[in-house]
């Protein structure tokens, strides 16, 4: 199998080794919608990622980084910079496919699910990878230096302040996340590699909103607000202080809760294929999206997927009205047309139409 530049491999390994202990996910207080949206995307990555907007210092980055410890290790082909799956052809690089076809022995290793941060000043070459045209013309080989999309394959790609990122780069990220492949073309030379990841973006609305066309392509959207309750704020400060004082002992206190949630997620992933949505629920969801004047069908598709993931998370097989109610705002609010003359809150509008269609009023059940 093709050997890649060792300096690149060392770079990847060093970044992996430098990852510091993350604050435990189950120790986080508040921000329930953000945590739920992330978990549902882990259960079914086809939901399409999460975009969270909120005040500075509300824990957006902390929540995302704490998610990694809930994810199981993955099997990858050794010395392959694309995190190729040794079995699934859809998650293999071309080099691994060719090696398997030729009967070459494939060595595997287990790694932590990759979590890649995309820096704000990243160039397209840094994100997608670069082709050494000179070497390709002289040696006749496709000399490719993988980018961040290669590292993020089968993992999570996190973009903080995504609303400040160049629209062209956001388009590239969304295209790769949706299609599962990254294509790099230079001077008639083309490289294609798997790039299947959960895209998570965050930002501060005071610094500008994401364009509606791009926002619509994120599966779920969460508005995060600063926690106002004094007792909750004190509890957050105390937990952070205890974690900073001794991360090891703090993590040990949450080991059971972490393992419990991790098992719930793994079980939900396994049972997801068995969850069926009754036809009438599909009709009701479609009517909800139609009455809200949502453009396109992404809202319908994402809501159906998220409902199934939520049911699986709760160890059930049957969809209930309250399941749709719980997740609909996460899937639909960012797809609503903004009318500056309307005084009614958009999320309240969703609730009103939901009640009319589903005839469901016991929203606390």
Curated annotation (Swiss-Prot):
GO terms for cellular component: chloroplast. Involved in chlorophyll biosynthesis; introduces a magnesium ion into protoporphyrin IX to yield Mg-protoporphyrin IX. It comes from the Eukaryota. The keyword Thylakoid does not apply. Keywords: ATP-binding, Chlorophyll biosynthesis, Chloroplast, Ligase, Nucleotide-binding, Photosynthesis, Plastid. Its EC number is 6.6.1.1. ATP binds at residues 54-61. This is Magnesium-chelatase subunit ChlI. It catalyses: protoporphyrin IX + Mg(2+) + ATP + H2O = Mg-protoporphyrin IX + ADP + phosphate + 3 H(+). GO terms for biological process: chlorophyll biosynthetic process; photosynthesis. NCBIfam families: BchI-ChlI (TIGR02030). SUPFAM superfamilies: P-loop containing nucleoside triphosphate hydrolases. The keyword Lipid metabolism does not apply. It holds the Pfam family Mg_chelatase. Pathway: Porphyrin-containing compound metabolism; chlorophyll biosynthesis. The lineage of its organism: Eukaryota, Sar, Rhizaria, Cercozoa, Chlorarachniophyceae. Belongs to the Mg-chelatase subunits D/I family. It is found in: Plastid, Chloroplast. GO terms for molecular function: ATP binding; magnesium chelatase activity.
């Amino acid at each position: 199998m093709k050997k890649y530049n060792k300096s690149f491999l060392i770079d990847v390994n060093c970044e992996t080794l430098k990852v510091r202990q993350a604050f435990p996910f189950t120790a986080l207080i508040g921000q329930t919608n953000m945590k739920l949206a992330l978990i549902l995307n882990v259960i079914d990555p086809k939901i399409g990622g999460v975009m969270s907007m909120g005040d500075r210092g509300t824990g957006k980055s902390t929540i995302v980084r704490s998610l990694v410890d809930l994810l199981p290790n993955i099997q990858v082909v050794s010395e392959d910079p694309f995190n190729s799956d040794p079995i699934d052809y859809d998650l293999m690089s071309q080099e691994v496919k060719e090696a398997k076809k030729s009967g070459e022995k494939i060595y595997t290793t287990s790694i932590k699910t990759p979590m890649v941060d995309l820096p704000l000043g990243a160039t397209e070459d840094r994100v997608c990878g670069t082709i050494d045209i000179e070497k390709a013309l002289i040696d006749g080989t496709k000399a490719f230096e993988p980018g961040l999309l290669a590292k993020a394959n089968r993992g999570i790609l996190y973009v903080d302040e995504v609303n400040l990122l160049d629209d062209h780069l956001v388009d590239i990220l969304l295209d790769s996340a949706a299609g599962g492949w990254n294509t790099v073309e230079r001077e008639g030379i083309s490289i294609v590699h798997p790039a299947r990841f959960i895209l998570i973006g965050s930002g501060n609305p005071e610094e500008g909103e994401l364009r509606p066309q791009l926002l619509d392509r994120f599966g779920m959207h969460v508005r995060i607000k600063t926690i106002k309750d004094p007792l909750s704020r004190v509890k957050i400060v105390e937990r952070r202080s205890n974690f900073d004082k001794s991360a090891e002992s703090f993590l040990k206190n949450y080991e059971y809760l972490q393992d419990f949630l991790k098992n719930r997620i793994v079980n939900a992933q396994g049972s997801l294929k068995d969850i069926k949505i009754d036809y009438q629920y599909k009709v009701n969801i479609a009517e909800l999206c139609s009455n809200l004047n949502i453009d396109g069908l992404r809202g319908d598709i994402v809501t159906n997927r998220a409902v199934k993931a939520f049911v699986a998370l709760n160890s059930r097989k049957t969809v209930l009205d309250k399941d749709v109610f719980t997740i609909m705002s996460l899937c639909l609010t960012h797809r609503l047309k903004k009318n500056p003359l309307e005084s009614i809150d958009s999320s309240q509008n969703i609730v009103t139409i939901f009640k009319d269609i589903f005839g469901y009023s016991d929203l606390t059940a």
